[in-house]
Amino acid sequence: MIDPVNIDTLKARFRGFYPVVIDVETSGLNASTNALLEIATITLKMNEDGWLHVDNMLHFHIKSFPGAILQPEALALNKINPNSPLRFAVTEQEALVEIFKMVHVGIKAQQCNKAIIVAHNASFDHSFLMAATERTNNIQDNPFHPFVTFDTAALSGLVFGQTVLSKACEYAGIIFDKNKAHSALYDAEKTAILFCTLVNAWKKLGGWPWKPSLITNNEGYHK
């Protein structure tokens, strides 16, 4: 049961999970063989009235790991030149140390148990983060749940009937510049705002805290 005194906390709202928005840009679709080239991480906070907001942010350009396959079509899509010195790229290890440090601080501050990735088509971002974690031997320090995610594509499909990030943002009243898409930082910012909008709308509509009276018995089985 939810403690009615503490319902307006991240801990209560997400069953002890600490939601963290992640967006990655890569050199292909295979997390094992393609490079993680850019990652943005955004933590969230809940105010005293239970409304979800963006909190802290980290953004890194990443050096491709040795032997990574760099697919030209992927690089054309995200407009990344892996060899450009202007990227000021860091290693996967350097980026993950800072990301995990920020997330661990947030977990402790919010009295949560574990972080959970929030992403648009979350299985993709989750797979690349986990692969990088294995490559850098950071598994023990990894604060994220090994398989559970919050997918804003699925949530937007439920709420708006739209699964594309730009379309979901449009329906949510969030300005989305398609010319800035496929930047990890830009997409993470929009995903974070979208997730907050969805969570806050559900609360505003009376869905949180949950009341069994909102549905009738076996409502999903009615023909």
From Swiss-Prot:
Mg(2+) 1 binds at residue 23. The record marks 124, 147 as: Important for substrate binding and specificity. Disulfide bonds: none annotated. Residues 20-195 form the Exonuclease domain. Its cofactor is Mg(2+). Pfam families: RNase_T. GO terms for molecular function: 3'-5' exonuclease activity; magnesium ion binding; nucleic acid binding; RNA exonuclease activity, producing 5'-phosphomonoesters. GO terms for cellular component: cytosol. Keywords: Exonuclease, Hydrolase, Magnesium, Metal-binding, Nuclease, tRNA processing. GO terms for biological process: DNA replication proofreading; tRNA processing. The active site is at 182 (proton donor/acceptor). Mg(2+) 2 binds at residues 23, 25, 182, 187. It comes from the Bacteria. Binds two Mg(2+) per subunit. The active form of the enzyme binds two Mg(2+) ions in its active site. The first Mg(2+) forms only one salt bridge with the protein. Its EC number is 3.1.13.-. The keyword Magnesium applies. Trims short 3' overhangs of a variety of RNA species, leaving a one or two nucleotide 3' overhang. Responsible for the end-turnover of tRNA: specifically removes the terminal AMP residue from uncharged tRNA (tRNA-C-C-A). Also appears to be involved in tRNA biosynthesis. PANTHER family: DNA POLYMERASE III SUBUNIT EPSILON (PTHR30231), RIBONUCLEASE T (PTHR30231:SF2). Homodimer. This is Ribonuclease T. The lineage of its organism: Bacteria, Pseudomonadati, Pseudomonadota, Gammaproteobacteria, Enterobacterales.
